């Protein structure tokens, strides 16, 4: 449930090349529940933001200046809703391409009366490139992205050197890239990419993974995995410059 893994070139030729970028997600058709459809019908006009051609003034969007986090691939939105509800003093931006998930999140926003959350329903790389100002995010979260297990599909993984550089450009100095995966080989791969990415510091004492941070909600899927003895690996990297 994550996005493409290469940064588009901003030229007319690049526009054509952008359409050929390898995507890290596959669009899936899915039925909408009544609640999800309600979320889209009633919530989208206010809470879903269009792709812009220039960086968005989120102080104006949210009506305040506050710490700002962005989550790529929020799935059905349970974790993002929980984080937004637990931290009303912060603002959250979620990116997800799958409509049932967007509808579920928006239904939760309406039900809980949240005002500190906005959504993009499109490719996160386009959102980062076109809508997010440089040095503006306090945190970017990437929880349980598709690991694309087969070697021939590794090029589809969102975590690539180009992604690390793009994220670094959008984080403030001191901002955090927080990733989590339930597949240890992908955690090792993330470490390989991030440990050589310039301008970052691994926050793990051992240079590997951090203990599960309290601010990341535990999902039902994760609890089930824990009962089965499956692990989860959290990685945190701080932008130095």
From Swiss-Prot:
Cited SUPFAM superfamilies: S-adenosyl-L-methionine-dependent methyltransferases
Which protein are we looking at?
tRNA (guanine-N(7)-)-methyltransferase
**Amino-acid positions noted as binding S-adenosyl-L-methionine in the UniProt annotation, renumbered to this chain:** 71, 96, 123, 146
Function per UniProt: Catalyzes the formation of N(7)-methylguanine at position 46 (m7G46) in tRNA.
Keywords of the record, alphabetical order, are:
Methyltransferase, S-adenosyl-L-methionine, Transferase, tRNA processing
EC number(s) per entry? 2.1.1.33
Q: Where is the composition biased (Polar residues)?
A: 1-10
Annotated pathway, please? tRNA modification; N(7)-methylguanine-tRNA biosynthesis
The superkingdom listed in its UniProt entry is Bacteria
Indicate which residues the UniProt annotation says bind substrate: 150, 182, 219-222
